[in-house]
């Protein structure tokens, strides 16, 4: 029956990526469905359009898990802090890179060994590129910035730099 089926009130998007997820989410929102997604790729690239459709249709779009999953940040940015003059967003938003940098700092591990340990413990994905090159953090920052500053911020507008070239000497100087 499709996403417009009157018996379906919620749509949970689990596909990832931007295509065809964007089409399905827009279709569900247009039909007035509540949509739940953790798709930071989609929100970082097409958040304005998706959130705009949710507003236009008075549909509920939930995406708290897309940014700092264990820390509720989206709702406070939208509601509790809406009247504040936010000037910057600072935070640790990627657990994999946080773990790697902590191991390099506290245990003196080199990057390669710290990444291997993170992978062994299940903190790093099989392909950790999005984490260690800063793409994951950049997408999260684009989403949070769009909300906090009430302005369209895309992933491409967020400066990202990975941690793959950080050495023990860099850590020493950072201390």
Where are these regions (language model features)?
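Short, small-residue-biased leader/transition segments that mark boundaries at the very start
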Residues: 2-7
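N-terminal Rossmann-like NAD(P) cofactor-binding module of classical short-chain dehydrogenase/reductase
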Residues: 11-12
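Short glycine-/small-residue-rich Rossmann-like dinucleotide-binding loops
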Residues: 15-16
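Rossmann-fold NAD(P)-binding glycine/threonine-rich loop
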Residues: 20-22, 26-27, 40-78
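Conserved active-site and cofactor/substrate-binding residues in soluble primary-metabolism enzymes
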Residues: 45, 68, 72, 84, ...
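Oxidoreductase and adenylate-handling cofactor-binding alpha/beta cores
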Residues: 73-86, 97-112, 139-153
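Substrate-binding/catalytic subdomain of NAD(P)-dependent oxidoreductase enzymes
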Residues: 113-175
């Amino acid at each position: 029956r499709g996403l417009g089926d009157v018996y379906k009130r919620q749509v949970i998007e689990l596909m990832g990526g931007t295509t065809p997820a964007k089409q399905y989410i827009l279709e569900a929102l247009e039909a007035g469905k509540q949509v739940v997604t953790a798709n930071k790729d989609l929100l970082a690239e097409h958040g304005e359009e998706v959130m705009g459709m949710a507003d236009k249709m008075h549909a509920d779009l939930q995406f708290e898990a897309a940014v700092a999953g264990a820390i509720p940040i989206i709702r406070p940015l939208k509601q509790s802090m809406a009247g504040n003059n936010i000037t910057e967003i600072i935070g640790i938003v990627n657990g994999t890179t946080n773990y790697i940098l902590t191991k390099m700092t506290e245990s003196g591990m080199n990057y390669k060994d710290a990444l291997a340990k993170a992978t062994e413990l299940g903190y790093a994905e099989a392909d950790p590129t999005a984490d260690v090159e800063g793409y994951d953090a950049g997408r999260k920052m684009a989403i949070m910035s769009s909300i906090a500053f009430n302005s369209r911020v895309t992933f491409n507008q967020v400066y990202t730099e990975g941690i793959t070239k950080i050495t023990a000497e860099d850590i020493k100087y950072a201390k």
